[in-house]
Amino acid sequence: MVFGDIHFLNRRYEPWDAYAQSKTANVLFAVEATRRWGGDGITVNALQPGTVRSNLQRYITDEDLERTRVHIEDENGSFHWKTPEQGAATSVLLATSPLLQGIGGRYFEDCNQAGPSQPGTGRGVAPYALDPDAATRLWEISLQTLAS
């Protein structure tokens, strides 16, 4: 998170950086929401559904997709689109599994809690995305933004 310029007003807008920052914000929100509401039985988690082909990519050129492909290939250097059902699996698990009762502030991928990030793979969760101080800071900035 670039807290001093969340909206890219003072730096060059790069779509993939903005996307990555929004994904980090999702995880930070889960951390802070669980801290605030977990005592009331409300937990929040973040997840990565995987690469599901959808209309979200309609404005992304094939060149841009190819450029990012290296970041989302598997350990064998292969790239596969998930089906919508495969992409939904982690969401369904988080929403319905009794095994996750009371578990919050975490990041999941492929129906499992994500491990530490693995550079160059697009897998795992970076430590800064789970930082409770950053989560609180983002929460406060969000409140200020909503109040204005």
Can you say where each PLM-predicted feature lies in the sequence?
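Non-catalytic terminal and boundary segments that flank Rossmann-like NAD(P)-dependent oxidoreductase
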Residues: 1, 126-148
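C-terminal helical subdomain
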Residues: 22, 70-123, 130-137
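C-lobe helix-loop cap of protein kinase catalytic domains
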Residues: 30, 92-96, 143
